[in-house]
Structures are given as C-alpha cells and as structure tokens.
C-alpha cells in the first residue's frame, strides 16, 4: 500500500475545512424574483428594533452600516444613527416610519406609499430593516452560552416590495471569558449582507 505524503494531508485538511466553512448556511434566506433587477444606488438602515435587548441598541446599527459601507455596493449608505436623528428632527418622517413599521409588524404589509415618503425624506432607494432577535449571555443545561440572533428585510422604496429577508442565530459556549456579542454580531452581519441582493 502506498503512503500519502505529509503535504498532501495538509492540502486535504485545508480543503475539508474550507468546504465545511463555506457551507455554513443562514437560518433563513428568502429572495424575491424581482431581486435580479434590483440595483439601488442608495440604502438606508432603519434603527434596529432591539426589543428587550437594550444592550444591542445602537451597536447593531453601527455594525450594519459599517459592513454596508465596506462592501462599496452603494454610492450612499444612510446609517441607523443618521436616520434616528432625522426621525427625531422631522415629525413627518417619524410618523411615516412609525406607521410603516406598525403595518409591517402587525399586518405583514409593506405600504408602498409610506415607502415613497421615507425614500424622499431620507434620499434612499432601498430600506434595510434590522431586528435583534437575541443578544444575550444565558445558561442552558448548566452551560454558559453567548447568543446573538438577527433578522433583516430589504425593501424596494419604489414599490414597497420586500426584495430579500434573512435571519440567523449563533450560539457560543464558554467557561470563563465571555465572547464579545458585538464581535459575534459583526461576523453574522457580514455573512448575511454577503447574501443580500444589490
């Protein structure tokens, strides 16, 4: 029997690791048929709905904005913090965003008229709507766990159509040193944005 040389084992090991890492899928990805013709030049990130996870507020907005800017896919990226300031300064925008999100959350209806108002007031062609599903340190069966879960929807402001949505959850077990939730979130956002139409 012929023996396989050491360097060949290294190459095989690297390929296996690369294939396994590349196969990590997101928990949820849905892309509309219209995505193939959707190429916005500008995108706005609505402030993330962090729900009970107040520690994630602001952090996730900054992470998403930074990842979008680094892709260089868009001429303009209006981040969650910038849109939050615009909402505070403009009552019409505040009302439009509040009503739009309420309809989206309660009726699963993306109102095209409100999308157009938000688009005009913010100067954007697409809206990214992030939600923090989980952002915590917890105990499960006696194990210490760090968990981060994020969902996103990409909406075409011309039609109000949800072009893409994705969601993912990662957990990391630890003993002494807590993993940084922000680092876990950044890694997850990169994976999600990589799958987003642009």
What kind of feature is each model-predicted range?
Residues 23-44, 108-110, 114-126, 137-198:
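C-terminal/domain-edge helix-coil "capping" segments
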Residues 10, 51-55, 175, 179, ...:
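Charge-dense, low-complexity intrinsically disordered segments
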Residues 10-21:
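Bacterial N-terminal signal peptides
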Residues 131-136:
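Generic short beta-strand segments
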Residues 1-11:
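Bacterial N-terminal signal peptides that target proteins for export
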Residues 15, 124-129:
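Glycine-rich, often proline-containing surface loops adjacent to acidic residues and nearby aromatics
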């Amino acid at each position: 029997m012929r023996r396989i040389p050491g360097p060949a084992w290294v190459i095989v090991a690297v390929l296996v690791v690369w294939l396994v890492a590349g196969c990590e899928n997101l928990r949820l990805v849905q892309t509309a048929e219209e995505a193939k013709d959707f190429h916005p030049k500008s995108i706005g990130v609505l402030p993330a709905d962090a729900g009970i996870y107040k520690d994630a507020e602001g952090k996730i907005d900054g992470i998403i904005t930074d990842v979008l800017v680094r892709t260089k896919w868009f001429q303009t990226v209006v981040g969650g913090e910038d849109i939050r300031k615009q909402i505070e300064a403009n009552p019409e925008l505040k009302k439009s965003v509040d009503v739009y999100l309420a309809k989206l959350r309660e009726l699963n209806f993306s109102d095209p008229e409100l999308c157009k108002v938000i688009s005009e007031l913010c100067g954007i062609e697409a809206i990214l709507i992030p939600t923090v599903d989980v952002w915590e340190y917890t105990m499960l069966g006696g194990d210490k766990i760090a968990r981060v879960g994020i969902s996103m929807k990409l909406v075409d402001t011309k039609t109000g159509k949800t072009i893409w949505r994705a969601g993912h959850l990662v957990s990391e077990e630890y003993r002494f040193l807590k993993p940084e939730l922000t680092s876990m979130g950044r890694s997850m956002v990169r994976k999600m944005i990589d799958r987003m139409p642009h």
